[in-house]
Every structure is written in structure tokens, then in C-alpha cells.
Swiss-Prot record:
Subunit structure: Homohexamer; trimer of dimers.
E.C. number(s) listed in UniProt: 4.6.1.17
Lineage: Bacteria, Pseudomonadati, Pseudomonadota, Gammaproteobacteria, Enterobacterales
Originating species: Salmonella arizonae (strain ATCC BAA-731 / CDC346-86 / RSK2980)
Any one GO biological process: Mo-molybdopterin cofactor biosynthetic process
Catalytic reaction list: (8S)-3',8-cyclo-7,8-dihydroguanosine 5'-triphosphate = cyclic pyranopterin phosphate + diphosphate
The family this protein is said to belong to: Belongs to the MoaC family.
Ligand binding (substrate): 75-77, 113-114
Protein name stated in the entry: Cyclic pyranopterin monophosphate synthase
Length: 161
């Protein structure tokens, strides 16, 4: 099993030194879900929410969150992201919204946390915009779908979960 990289020999949290690492293209994808009543989902799909376009607002929030991950998650490096994409899809058969984020850069450290933050904040934004009509929405699961680039190699979740 790999060692925790954010813990030093004395057991203290620290920011990993990436200065000696080579710059490579790195990409990560994550997903999150928001489950709600069918009436709440229909309101979003039909564009009848009094606060405006829920998907557009959540998309922008997710993109902004990816760009500010280093301010939210301790020990994350500030990154020069070259691409952030947030896609939202209503899944009426499951009464939920699926959010998928993609982050990419050429750099010395990965973008997994940025992708996870983008998907999570987009989900939180949907909750915030819809809580006036439904407070018992459920956020989750949130997970990393895939990552590529860097020394640790590529990862892809088993989609048969």
C-alpha cells in the first residue's frame, strides 16, 4: 500500500514538495448525484424555478469551485487549470441529477481534488437553489471516476459497482 504523502516522518501534515516532478498532462473526472422528489426534478427540467436556471448556476459554481480548490482544501496546491467542464444530466427514471466534472492541466500535481470539488459544489448549489421546495434531497455518492497522468499512473473506477 502507498504511503500518505501529506504526512511527514514526524506524523505532521505538510504540503508535498512537487518542485522536482516533471510536468505532464493530467486529467481527472468525478461524479456526484442529487436525488430529489420527481416534482422537484420536473421543476428544474421545465425551467420553472423562481431562482432561475438551476443547471447553469450549478455549472458555473462547479467551475468556480475547481479553480478555488486550493483555498478550500488544506495542503492542495494552487493549479493553473487548462480545462474545467461540468455537465449536468437529469435522470428522471431515478429522480436525480447526475453531475460529471472534468479537470485538465499540464503540471506537476494531479487534479483529482479539483474534479471532486467541482462535482461536489455543483451538487451543493442544486441543493441550495431547491431547498425552499424540498429540504430532504440527498447528495451522493460523490466519487472519482478516472485520473490520468503523473507517477501514480492511471485510474478508472469499475463501472460495475
Amino acid at each position: 500500500m502507498s504511503q500518505l504523502t501529506h504526512i511527514n516522518a514526524a506524523g505532521e501534515a505538510h504540503m508535498v514538495d512537487v518542485s522536482a516532478k516533471a510536468e505532464t498532462v493530467r486529467e481527472a473526472r468525478a461524479e456526484a448525484f442529487v436525488t430529489m422528489h420527481s416534482e422537484t426534478l420536473a421543476m428544474i427540467i421545465d425551467g420553472k424555478h423562481h431562482k432561475g436556471d438551476v443547471f447553469a448556476t450549478a455549472r458555473i459554481a462547479g467551475i468556480q469551485a475547481a479553480k478555488r480548490t486550493w483555498e478550500l482544501i488544506p495542503l492542495c496546491h494552487p493549479l493553473l487549470l487548462s480545462k474545467v467542464e461540468v455537465q449536468l444530466q437529469a435522470e428522471s427514471e431515478h429522480n436525480r441529477v447526475r453531475i460529471e466534472s472534468l479537470c485538465r492541466l499540464t503540471g506537476k500535481t494531479g487534479v483529482e481534488m479539483e474534479a471532486l470539488t467541482a462535482a461536489s459544489v455543483a451538487a451543493l448549489t442544486i441543493y441550495d437553489m431547491c431547498k425552499a421546495v424540498q429540504k430532504d434531497m440527498v447528495i451522493g455518492p460523490v466519487r472519482l471516476l478516472a485520473k490520468s497522468g503523473g507517477n501514480s499512473g492511471d485510474f478508472k473506477v469499475d463501472t460495475h459497482d
